[in-house]
Design a protein with these regions (language model features):
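Membrane-interface soluble catalytic domains
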Residues: 4-131
Length: 131
């Protein structure tokens, strides 16, 4: 909290805990390279914002109110998210969103497995960068 340096405000768009570090670094105006999968919630266009979820054996990606849910044995489901009720309902599957979800989770897995999900420096893979 530093109102002399950063004006207080409210962001109504999609953001989760993985977006905190990139957003704070963006507010501070610091150039950065990081392996974060989160995004600067104040400088990422709404149509590019995503949220990651996991529950039991499923993982999911939310974008534009649509959820791609990846389960065991390559199962895929779709859902629609209503931000007013914070509820979910049935939705048609969206191959592009499913591919994006697979890409995010597969990239994270491959980086971690190969020991390349590390802070910037020798051998690091940059996932996100400053604007």
């Amino acid at each position: 909290y530093s109102p002399k340096h950063i004006a207080p405000g409210v962001e109504e768009g999609l953001a989760t805990q993985v977006d905190v570090a990139p957003t704070v670094l963006g507010l501070l105006g610091l150039p950065y390279e990081a392996p974060f999968f989160g995004q600067d919630a104040l400088h990422t266009p709404p149509e590019r914002r995503v949220a990651f979820f996991s529950h039991n054996h499923d993982v999911a990606l939310l974008r534009d109110g649509r959820l791609a849910i990846l389960g065991l044995h390559k199962s895929v489901e779709a859902a629609a998210f209503d931000p007013v009720s914070a509820g979910y309902g049935p939705a048609p599957r969206e191959p592009e969103l499913e591919s994006l979800a697979i890409a995010y989770y597969q990239t994270a897995y491959e980086l971690f497995r190969a020991g390349r999900y590390v802070l910037p420096g020798k051998g690091a893979t940059r996932v996100a960068a400053s604007r």
